[in-house]
Amino acid sequence: MTELFIDGAWIAGSGPAFASRNPGTDAIAWQGDSASAADVDRAVASARRAFAGWSALDFEARCEIVKRFAALLTERKEAIATAIGRETGKPLWEARTEVAAMAAKVGISIQAYQERTGEKRQDMADGVAVLRHRPHGVVAVFGPYNFPGHLPNGHIVPALIAGNTVVFKPSELAPGVARATVEVWQEAGLPAGVLNLVQGEKDTGIALANHRQIDGLFFTGSSDTGTLLHRQFGGRPEIVLALEMGGNNPLVIGEVEDLDAAVHHTIQSAFLSAGQRCTCARRIFVPQGAFGERFLARLADVTSKITADVFDADPQPFMGAVISARAAAKLVDAQSRLIEQGAKPIIEMTQRDPRLGFVNASIIDVTGVANLPDEEHFGPLAQIVRYATFDEAIERANDTAFGLSAGLLADDAHAWEHFRRTIRAGIVNWNRPTNGASSAAPFGGTGRSGNHRPSAYYAADYCAYPMASVESTQLTLPASLSPGLHF
């Protein structure tokens, strides 16, 4: 099989074989040989050779290729959505929205580059000051499995627009989506070597991250892996490292008038994409008293009716499987540890079949758990924390090393003003789900959630470096000389 895309050609990998599986059926979705260290070296060398020509290409010419990519995505929406659903378990209705977001991101990325990193001029008394932006060179892009099309392209598109060349290492759990996406780039007319694909598992990733000829590494994925990368590049200031990672995100519930609206937004926050969005709410803060009890009863009632099914089921389910049977088992195990520490299940999570990734959406009350672990459980496991005062809720919401997203559901505008001033997160929403974000706004967090704003408007900032010039069209001796100079 030809699994790798290097220097404009599909070639076979020379590393170990691996496969991806449909988490809802356990059927093999993709299989092939991974990229060895030698394959990775060839991919980086190809990107290095292509850099001079690609970066010298007119900005508009680069953008035309990227626009063709977006148009082809729209044409192939159903095929790519099917590939996403097959490998991730994500229902087709949601996979289709991912492909649409991939295409829409192109226009935003072009606008962002022009507005944030385009050329700017300022007249001076004896010339002009010019700010330009230059690409870094060869950048490695590491993609996650939860949005295997959308999130890698949130790095790749702005990197290419800026004039960089790319070596792309997708998640080993979604190699088929990566291949389908790169095929679209190839058809769009991307020159050989500008984008290279290396498939593989941990060893492939290590070979790419350790390569001495990359100029940047753009990563979306777990905080644990991102932290390792940050430590690895701690002594290499020449490497541009952009990290977008996870969160232990809080959603604070106020005593609102519309109970069902609050329940709906809570379910969307906690269980959309089977809880596999980095912005999903992990901790739900509920007021003590009668309202809190009514809210939890209604939340449990609606949640208990949520079904999970295969990605192409008819009718479509709200949730699909989580990414793998192993991931499902880890979620159930995390729940068990919390129960051992004193948590009380409201709806207990179970794994439908040990071979598959199906788990039910679960709600567990952790109010009485001392020293609650500050962990991101990447799935539909909602932890309930009851609070006595609004200030207590905010204090406990901020008690995390992460800082990606946070939300408040409340009718009181004064409560919102206080919340947005005191909460610590990069995405803070009011009366909207925590995982609602605009591609035209910064996307990212603070603390262990990352150090840049990839996959959105601000991605242009780390894809090129600023170059300042002071220029004059005519070389002349200045009228006033420095002391001690005689002509």
Curated annotation (Swiss-Prot):
The active site is at residues 244, 278. The keyword Oxidoreductase applies. It is an enzyme of class 1 (oxidoreductase). PANTHER family: ALDEHYDE DEHYDROGENASE-RELATED. NAD(+) binds at residues 221-226. The gene is astD. It catalyses: N-succinyl-L-glutamate 5-semialdehyde + NAD(+) + H2O = N-succinyl-L-glutamate + NADH + 2 H(+). Pathway: Amino-acid degradation; L-arginine degradation via AST pathway; L-glutamate and succinate from L-arginine: step 4/5. HAMAP family: Aldedh_AstD. This is N-succinylglutamate 5-semialdehyde dehydrogenase. Catalyzes the NAD-dependent reduction of succinylglutamate semialdehyde into succinylglutamate. Its EC number is 1.2.1.71. The lineage of its organism: Bacteria, Pseudomonadati, Pseudomonadota, Betaproteobacteria, Burkholderiales. One of its GO terms (molecular function) is succinylglutamate-semialdehyde dehydrogenase activity. GO terms for biological process: arginine catabolic process to glutamate; arginine catabolic process to succinate. It holds the Pfam family Aldedh. Belongs to the aldehyde dehydrogenase family. AstD subfamily. NCBIfam families: arg_catab_astD, PRK09457.1. Keywords: Arginine metabolism, NAD, Oxidoreductase.
